[in-house]
Amino acid sequence: MDKLTHINQQGDAHMVDVSDKKITTREATAMAIVSMKQSTLELILSSSNTKGDVLVIARIAGIYAAKKCWDLIPLCHPLMLSKIMVELTPNEKNATIEIKTLVKLDGKTGVEMEALTAASVTALTIYDMCKSVDRFIKIGEIQLLEKKGGKSGHWKLENV
């Protein structure tokens, strides 16, 4: 039977003890998609936003968010991340920006939450920087695409 790892036998929340786990290379990839009006995407791509270059600032916010995940999500471990990558791919046909994040470390616990947090905060930053010109921005499809390493091994979302 499956059980929640962050709940003890008494039903109390706790941070999982990873002290007996082996150090392995762990990697996670996540994504999000930000949909907007065509004119908003055109503003972003022309760097005409009065708040600055949206894609540069969103990428930096995503990197920072991965590093601060443990500060945002109470039961996450503070981790020494070795790689954080945030890719932003505008799709002019669909008026979207696809966000793909990759986080890596050599450690005792996975980095799925860091990759998901990076994707989420990148999307939220795009929203924040563009909300004055587009109230219809939508953030969606936040999901884990792949994870490698650790006891559970390699997992990949099919049809990606």
Curated annotation (Swiss-Prot):
Pathway: Cofactor biosynthesis; molybdopterin biosynthesis. The active site is at residue 128. Pfam families: MoaC. It catalyses: (8S)-3',8-cyclo-7,8-dihydroguanosine 5'-triphosphate = cyclic pyranopterin phosphate + diphosphate. Substrate binds at residues 75-77, 113-114. GO terms for molecular function: cyclic pyranopterin monophosphate synthase activity; GTP 3',8'-cyclase activity. InterPro entries: MoaC, MoaC_bact/euk, MoaC_sf, MoCo_biosynth_MoaA/MoaC, Mopterin_CF_biosynth-C_dom. One of its GO terms (biological process) is Mo-molybdopterin cofactor biosynthetic process. Homohexamer; trimer of dimers. Belongs to the MoaC family. This is Cyclic pyranopterin monophosphate synthase. It comes from Ruthia magnifica subsp. Calyptogena magnifica.
